[in-house]
């Protein structure tokens, strides 16, 4: 039997394969159910136990050699095809399957670029946040509904949570930097809400903060109006009184869109209590803050009727957004 194995090895040493059909014939000949290797293993069962050690080792080496030859010829065949493709300059080029920007990314960067023009710089922070930065420092009283389990994702056995807004970034920045401050903080935020066509447990916000001496509500209105004009074009807007724990006075801005008033921005003058919490003198400095949901604006611009489309990774949907609006 060792002589058979030796003769097969000699045959393998000089074998040459030039096509896919020859390679398949070689595979079946040696590794098929009725192939040479199977026949040898059947014969191996009948030999004397004293010879099995040496013959078994030779058989396994032969099997590995045959499999390696198949892999080698497969590689050479592929390389040959690749070389032909490179050399054949008459063949048509391959179309590249290019991706496209996500609609939320398109809107987010458009907003950022507008505020960059008037001196706002980007500032980011962690999505897992301490209660101090997300609530306490922002003047949320202990009885505020946002502190309840039904509105916020709290992390068990800790004073951490998933941030409910990017205002927490403003607190972190004010703790380490003194006025003048002019920042915007884009990012993901989380609310314990039922997922539906108009709400989601995770969405994106951009919030802004301007802090300096003698900043007034007039400065807030002019900044917001600058954004509206550059983003939406000539539009009819209105400011309505509102309430936020971290601003006083507070307002919401509505835009007339398809003959309906739609709320798109919450804003107001930074509450003096918030400034005291970050060791900034409210008698010397004042400022304003604002925030907007990116999904809401994206739904408006692209006339999309279901927020869930943004998170389903459906290429039929995503491929529609190849250019800036």
From Swiss-Prot:
One of its GO terms (molecular function) is tRNA binding. The keyword ATP-binding applies. It catalyses: tRNA(Phe) + L-phenylalanine + ATP = L-phenylalanyl-tRNA(Phe) + AMP + diphosphate + H(+). Its cofactor is Mg(2+). Keywords: Aminoacyl-tRNA synthetase, ATP-binding, Cytoplasm, Ligase, Magnesium, Metal-binding, Nucleotide-binding, Protein biosynthesis. It is found in: Cytoplasm. Gene3D superfamilies: Bira Bifunctional Protein, Domain 2. It is an enzyme of class 6 (ligase). GO terms for cellular component: cytoplasm. InterPro entries: aa-tRNA-synth_II, aa-tRNA-synth_II/BPL/LPL, Phe-tRNA-synth_IIc_asu, Phe-tRNA_ligase_II_N, Phe_tRNA_ligase_alpha1_bac, Phenylalanyl-tRNA_Synthase, tRNA-bd_arm. Mg(2+) binds at residue 248. Binds 2 magnesium ions per tetramer. Its main location: cytoplasm. Its EC number is 6.1.1.20. GO terms for biological process: phenylalanyl-tRNA aminoacylation. Belongs to the class-II aminoacyl-tRNA synthetase family. Phe-tRNA synthetase alpha subunit type 1 subfamily. Tetramer of two alpha and two beta subunits. This is Phenylalanine--tRNA ligase alpha subunit. It comes from Karelsulcia muelleri (strain GWSS).
